[in-house]
Amino acid sequence: MALNLRKNHQILKIINDALIDLPAPSNISTWWNFGSLLGICLITQIVTGLLLAMHYTADTNLAFSSVAHMCRDVQFGWLIRNLHANGASFFFICIYLHIGRGLYYGSYLNKETWNVGVILLLTLMATAFVGYVLPWGQMSFWGATVITNLFSAIPYIGQTLVEWAWGGFSVDNPTLTRFFALHFLLPFVIVGLTLVHLTFLHETGSNNPLGIPSDCDKIPFHPYYTIKDILGFVLMLSLLVSLALFSPNLLGDPENFTPANPLVTPPHIKPEWYFLFAYAILRSIPNKLGGVLALAASILVLFLTPLLHTSKLRSMTFRPLSQILFWTLVANVLILTWVGSQPVEHPFIIIGQLASFTYFTIILVLFPLAAALENKLLKL
């Protein structure tokens, strides 16, 4: 009998075990689509980014003009740029929904997968930040100045660290050059981490909405989840193309259409929308080092979630108190996002401080307490 190449060839076997014959729970919902959507986002960003890099010039005198030239004179350059800029937004929408799914259904109990995922989030944030600097508009320049300056809050080595990152005494040509190099490199680091993420995931298998073992009822990934993922791809890419064609600048800052000028500070420096919640937490603490620590903690707190799981049930499906807290946390993050886009004045300062306090309280205190209470109420 002839060997089945798909199951015996060294390389095809890996693909087969990950995408075709992978045993998957029979009841995973659309919330499990976002992992594959993130993969498509990554591929889209690498392809469009590579095409943009072919026309971009990483020099302070030419960067802004090279981006304008791309949009005017390169075949479909405007489309490639708009897909790349808005693709970043979709990347973050998908990753936040993916993390939300993980928190709700207790997927963080696959500790290795979860920890690699948090590292992936941090790498993605770094990539998006250095990428935003490249067009060398006003918000690019001032965003780079403000955020890199935060490292100067680190005691003793802070100022040296910042000047080392800048390659001089201010954000200038060396900074832009190294940011371009990093922006080119980091997506490939993300690809590597994604493979590690998947390797750990396939050790344990996927979680499911009930949060119970699903070994007794598994179905092959292909054709069931391949077709389901393709539907997700079509829907997300349709939305991305629609945004890029109809309203490409909806999520951008008009300030970035002005070339960078170190002598003119924009009236309100703010990052892209997907960083606003963390920016609001940073701003809500009146001390520089305290703000930087809170900013770091807002993401690093995700590493603690597996340790703070006190419930005897994995998922929140049967835990109404935790559900209320979860949706309060979601609303809270949306409030932080809105506050981050507002000027630093009353009442936004106090709203931001309350929302920041609530963010950490829900994750670090209320989630474990509610879960322990539910154990009692459900007599577990």
Curated annotation (Swiss-Prot):
Membrane topology per record: Multi-pass membrane protein
SUPFAM superfamilies named in the record: a domain/subunit of cytochrome bc1 complex (Ubiquinol-cytochrome c reductase), Transmembrane di-heme cytochromes
InterPro entries on file: Cyt_b/b6_C (IPR005798), Cyt_b/b6_C_sf (IPR036150), Cyt_b/b6_N (IPR005797), Cytb/b6-like_sf (IPR027387), Cytochrome_b (IPR030689), Cytochrome_b_C_euk/bac (IPR048260), Cytochrome_b_N_euk/bac (IPR048259), Di-haem_cyt_TM (IPR016174)
GO MF annotation terms: metal ion binding; ubiquinol-cytochrome-c reductase activity
Cofactor: heme b
Alphabetical list of Pfam families matching this protein: Cytochrom_B_C, Cytochrome_B
Binding site for heme b b566: 98, 197
Gene3D superfamilies: Cytochrome Bc1 Complex, Chain C (1.20.810.10)
Entry GO CC: mitochondrial inner membrane; respiratory chain complex III
GO biological process: mitochondrial electron transport, ubiquinol to cytochrome c
Miscellaneous section: Heme 1 (or BL or b562) is low-potential and absorbs at about 562 nm, and heme 2 (or BH or b566) is high-potential and absorbs at about 566 nm.
Quaternary context: The cytochrome bc1 complex contains 11 subunits: 3 respiratory subunits (MT-CYB, CYC1 and UQCRFS1), 2 core proteins (UQCRC1 and UQCRC2) and 6 low-molecular weight proteins (UQCRH/QCR6, UQCRB/QCR7, UQCRQ/QCR8, UQCR10/QCR9, UQCR11/QCR10 and a cleavage product of UQCRFS1). This cytochrome bc1 complex then forms a dimer.
Name of the protein: Cytochrome b
Provenance organism: Oreothlypis gutturalis (Flame-throated warbler)
Encoding gene (name): MT-CYB
